[in-house]
Amino acid sequence: MGCSAHLVVHGGNELLLAAAVDRLRELESWWSRFREDSDITLANRRAGLPTEVHEDTLAVVARAMLAWRQTAGKFDITTLPAVLAAGYTHSATTHQPAPDLGTRRIGLGALVAVDYEAGTLTVPPGGAIDLGGIGKGFAADLVAEELVEAGATGALVNLGGDIALVGSPSDAPSWHLGIDDPRATGTHVATLRMACGGIATSGTTVRRWQHDDGTTTHHLIDPATGRPASYGIRTITVMAADAATAESFTTAAMTMTPTDAIAMIQKFGLAALVVTDDHQVLTTPTFEEFRA
């Protein structure tokens, strides 16, 4: 999934931790757009035709389609062609190039089809999908839940800043987390206390690169324009019942103005903190419930 992983397991053992790492590698092998043999690449190559994929792949794509509906298309997994056009063509960790899919279109989110009975995923003709805006959160949720089901009393799974919290730590009633401040490296803009759930952060400061002409850009695409979003948000952190929801809503929020993003988050009863391009900090009223 092109990121670092950090796992904290309470009440478990090294075997549980090793199994969780293997599980993350398995999910990445199915979902990475940089692998020739992943479910996502195979489905993209067969755009317009049903492709047999793993059950977890069907589940994460179905969850992505729910997020597409909830955000009125602001979250859209069919923006991969625009992501590639913007320059995000190689894995940030392995530097492996993404498979060449030829010319594809964006904005086809309504046409992605999941068939649980047949076990197939159909990418729209002429389209291509990428789970970059939800896959890490969904994987964190799965692995954290599986750790607790296997006997751990608490699990924290952090995949590139998208975090799932299940159960509780053995030395405290809740988990304590810090939100990095993009205005001052090495500092926190806020510290949080969460009993369980998910937290995710999106922003324009990490997946960012420079073109030959000296201009810089990032990977967060506005489905309405096909271009990297630039509406005034530098970073946004969302707290939700699970990490997949938090991640998909942070991705959608990046395609909106700070005010509109806060309004959307409030509409769904979530909590958020926004740091704007002009260094303001905005929060939803519900954010104060999590502040440590």
What label would you give each PLM region?
Residues M1-A292:
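Mature catalytic core of soluble alpha/beta enzymes
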